From Swiss-Prot:
InterPro entries: UPF0346, YozE_SAM-like, YozE_SAM-like_sf. HAMAP family: UPF0346. It comes from the Bacteria. Belongs to the UPF0346 family. It comes from Latilactobacillus sakei subsp. sakei (strain 23K). This is UPF0346 protein LCA_0996.
Amino acid sequence: MKQSFYRYLMTQRDPNNYEPVAQFANNAFFDQSFPKHEGDYELLSQYLELNGSYLPSMLIFDEAYQLYQESEQA
C-alpha cells in the first residue's frame, strides 16, 4: 500500500537537524491544513505554492518528493 507524501515526510522530521528536508518536515508537521492523505505531485505543489510560507524554496519540496518516490520503489 502506497503511503502518502505527508506520512513519508514525517519520517524525515528531526528538530535537531537543520537540513532543508528535515526543516520542511518539521514545519509541515505544524501545518494543520497540509494535505495529509495526498501523494500527487501537482496537488501537493499547488498547495505549497499557495500555503507553504514556511518553505523557502520549492526545490526543497522537489528534493523531498524525489526521496518519497524512491522510497516507494524500494
